[in-house]
Amino acid sequence: MSGDDAAVFKPNARVLAYHGPLIYEAKVIKIHEKNKTFIEDGEGKHQPIEGGNLPEEYYSVNAYFVHYKGWKAKWDEWVGPDRILEYNEANVQAQKELKEQLTKAKIKPKVKAEPAVASTGTKKRGMPVSSASTVTKKKKTDPNRVNEVSIFMKPELKYILVDDWEFITKERKIINIPSSRPVTVILNDYLQSKKDQDTSHQTMDVINEIMQGLELYFNKSLSLILLYKFERLQYMNLLKEHGDDLRPSELYGVEHLLRLFVALPGLIAQTTMDSVSINVLVKQSKDILEFITDNMSVYLNDYVNVSPAYDSLARS
């Protein structure tokens, strides 16, 4: 996305926007151009940013107030440049591919234990029985498409993402943060598992570098594309508490990490990485997803009910 002072999209533009790990069609209602002191609506009228509910994090960037097609107005929200995409054939195809990763999980029956509901209002998923390892079939690629990658995710993990979406958007729960097993712990556990397999020092250096890159991706993208609207108030509260010391990888856990892997192919497509580096990243991504599948019961987090005040503010 462009960093120019002029806004990339204008009011009333048809766009695509990330909401959580998926992409939805949306319409731009209002815009805020980088470093400007006003917000512009579809009629060209200006409103001071102080009265436009523009989050302070968007004061210094191009930002867009969008309405998701077919959604109620309560879901309208401000999004930054990293969450908005031009409505074109390539991006619509990316939207479909992301959606298919979740809808395929719904086609197959879930084998799940009854979710346990604690007296405190917490809710935790039961895990499906692990399936045998599946060989990923390579898709035919179009040579004209740049950095097209596919990261295989087992049905067990897709079930987690489907439940995750339902708990947050349907039941209006949030994940209990901080996680007892945050992303940084998961990545370190994976590194230790590779060391225990007597992996060579040279290979370990490569794996360690990739894990550092994944953690950096996670920290940079969490607030931009990995949160549902209902979770943003929780994030803002954490930001107030931790300030510049906030590192999402030390607070958020496996559910948000899985959302990153769903979005990762799209992120890779926007980089200038060479094909060798991409192949190494994809291979390690598949390996760590396999590791997460085998250890999911250790990493799952509780969902908790929110207060009426939180519910009201988060939906406003």
UniProtKB/Swiss-Prot annotation:
Q: What is the protein's known function?
A: Involved in deacetylation of histones, chromatin assembly and chromosome segregation. May act as a transcriptional oscillator, directing histone deacetylases to specific chromosomal domains. Component of the NuA4 histone acetyltransferase complex which is involved in transcriptional activation of selected genes principally by acetylation of nucleosomal histone H4 and H2A. The NuA4 complex is also involved in DNA repair.
GO terms (BP aspect)? DNA repair; DNA replication-dependent chromatin assembly; negative regulation of antisense RNA transcription; nucleosome disassembly; positive regulation of transcription elongation by RNA polymerase II; regulation of DNA-templated DNA replication initiation; regulation of RNA stability; transcription elongation by RNA polymerase II
Localization, UniProt: Nucleus
One Gene Ontology molecular-function label: histone reader activity
In this chain the MRG domain maps to 145-316
**Cross-referenced Gene3D superfamilies:** 2.30.30.140, MRG domain
Q: Which domain of life is it from?
A: Eukaryota
Map out region (Disordered) in residue numbers.
114-140
Keyword set for this entry?
Answer: Chromatin regulator, DNA damage, DNA repair, Nucleus, Transcription, Transcription regulation
Classification via SUPFAM superfamilies: Chromo domain-like
High-level lineage? Eukaryota, Fungi, Dikarya, Ascomycota, Saccharomycotina
The record's section on InterPro entries has: Chromo-like_dom_sf, MRG, MRG_C_sf, MRG_dom, MSL3_chromo-like
Tudor-knot domain location is 13-84
Q: How does it assemble?
A: Component of the NuA4 histone acetyltransferase complex.
Tell me its family: Belongs to the MRG family.
The species is Debaryomyces hansenii (strain ATCC 36239 / CBS 767 / BCRC 21394 / JCM 1990 / NBRC 0083 / IGC 2968) (Yeast)
Q: Write down any Gene Ontology CC term.
A: nucleosome disassembly/reassembly complex
Name listed for the protein in its UniProt record:
Chromatin modification-related protein EAF3
